[in-house]
From Swiss-Prot:
Organism name: Talaromyces marneffei (strain ATCC 18224 / CBS 334.59 / QM 7333) (Penicillium marneffei)
Main location: mitochondrion
Name of protein: Required for respiratory growth protein 9, mitochondrial
Keyword Transferase part of the UniProt annotation: no
Basic residues bias locations: 115-127
């Protein structure tokens, strides 16, 4: 046979216990419980849970409330205003017989700030210890190679880099050295830098260097310059910026006078005077003066 589980709960002891508790609820509700909870609802008492928001969020009850189970039932009945039938069903259930488990008592409100203070003190101590360890044992700086420091110094000195916009020819370098050697007080480094439009550091390095080209290097340089000038002059002649080298310029050249260059095909560039026999007279007209005597005009 199947037995109903709800019928097992309806024992004599459970029914008597429920009736006794309902009468206690009525007596307390009529006298003191109504006033007490009404005051509590209208003006809540200042407790640790109200003062501390952390504790107010947590739902817990005091040990006295757990000892007296009737107080909990009174508060629930007054707040909800449930009928007596509902109360009887709740009381006759097995949940009422089971003793409520006492939860762990939470930490008091006075312990929390102490713990926070201790945490802050510990954090400060750890921070001071860390700073002290940094001061006592600073990290060793990695030593950079010599070439890197030299490169940074050269970059600061030469802002334009290794390929400057203006490059001086060898003749200008020799001129700079000669001027500084003859009159170092007049041709100082800033003056030379301003004159040749380069940086003072470049002037210092030019004066400091003692390199001199060899004879072979000089000959190669002269040949290279001659070819360069020929190209430049021929291009200028094609554009009409320079006159072509003619015969009249060849006659006046130093090479012609020294006999290093052959005579041109047209030797008689100007007309020669006609040959006159000896004893002929040359008449020179002078409009402002009188005629010269005949003896002075005769050619011997």
């Amino acid at each position: 046979m199947a037995v109903c589980a709800a019928s097992r709960r309806l024992t004599l002891s459970n029914v008597l216990q429920g009736v006794y508790r309902t009468e206690l609820v009525r007596q307390h509700a009529e006298n003191s419980a109504i006033n007490f909870y009404a005051q509590r609802l209208t003006r809540p008492a200042l407790t640790a849970a109200n003062s501390n928001p952390w504790l107010s969020k947590r739902s817990f009850s005091t040990s006295q409330a757990f000892k007296d189970g009737g107080n909990i039932v009174i508060y629930d009945v007054i707040a909800t205003k449930a009928p007596d039938g509902d109360v009887l069903t709740e009381l006759t259930s097995t949940k009422a017989e089971d003793s409520p488990k006492t939860p762990k008592s939470p930490k008091s409100s006075s312990e929390k700030p102490k713990s926070s203070k201790t945490k802050t003190k510990a954090a400060k101590k750890s921070g001071t210890k860390y700073l002290a360890s940094e001061l006592v044992n600073p990290e060793k700086k990695v030593k950079r190679p010599h070439w890197q420091t030299q490169k940074e110094a050269l970059e600061k000195k030469f802002t334009e880099g290794w390929h400057p916009r203006k490059k001086l020819p060898p003749d200008s370098l020799d001129t700079i050295r000669h001027l500084h050697a003859t009159k170092p007080d007049v041709w100082t480094t800033p003056v030379l830098a301003d004159q040749f439009k380069i940086s003072p550091e470049a002037i210092r390095r030019i004066l400091k260097s003692k390199w001199q080209p060899t004879e072979e290097e000089r000959e190669r340089r002269e040949e290279r310059w001659a070819e360069r000038y020929k190209k430049i002059y021929s291009h200028m002649e094609e554009l009409g910026l320079r006159r072509r080298k003619g015969e009249w310029t060849a006659k006046v050249s130093d090479a012609r006078r020294l006999g290093l260059e052959g005579k041109s095909i047209r030797q008689n560039f100007r007309r020669k005077p006609q040959a006159r026999p000896e004893g002929t007279e040359i008449n020179i007209s002078r409009p402002d003066r009188e005629a010269s005597p005949k003896e002075s005009t005769s050619l011997e």
